[in-house]
Amino acid sequence: MKGIIVSDGVYREEDVFAGQRIFMTPELIEKTMLGLVQKYNQYRPTTKSSPYAVAAWLLHAFVSIHPFIDGNGRMGRILANLVLFSYGFPFPVPISADNDEYIKSLRLADRYYEKGRDTSHLALIILNSSHSIYKNYLSNLEL
């Protein structure tokens, strides 16, 4: 079966890059992922940030690690939705990876990574996506 990746769920063992972006070496992935999970588990219950900001932070952090050969963007968007669900959001929010604004927001967050990871533009995209899904839902209700 051509095109099927058989290493799903397994951290990558080779270097990867996308465009001009070179991601961390495979040797650092497991430790960095454990650190991300610990940081999220400490951050989530105590933060005063909006759910959109937390979702954007986790999405960007995950795709920056780029732990898998394929599917990192999809998994990051699933994690962003997991954050929103943890705040009581009832619907998944479709965050389009094909959107130029989405790509731009990831690059902006990369640019400010050393200064504390400014993911506010990405949070706004998630907020707008959420607004669209709720607006669509409400417009289809028969009141």
From Swiss-Prot:
User: Can you supply one Gene Ontology CC term for this chain's record?
Assistant: membrane
Spell out the SUPFAM superfamilies in the cross-references.
Fic-like
What is its membrane topology? Single-pass membrane protein
State where the protein is found: Membrane
Q: Which residues cross the membrane?
A: 49-69
Q: Which organism is it from?
A: Dictyostelium discoideum (Social amoeba)
Q: Give residue ranges for domain Fido.
A: 1-128
Question: Protein name, please?
Answer: Fido domain-containing protein DDB_G0283145
The alphabetized UniProt keywords are: Membrane, Transmembrane, Transmembrane helix
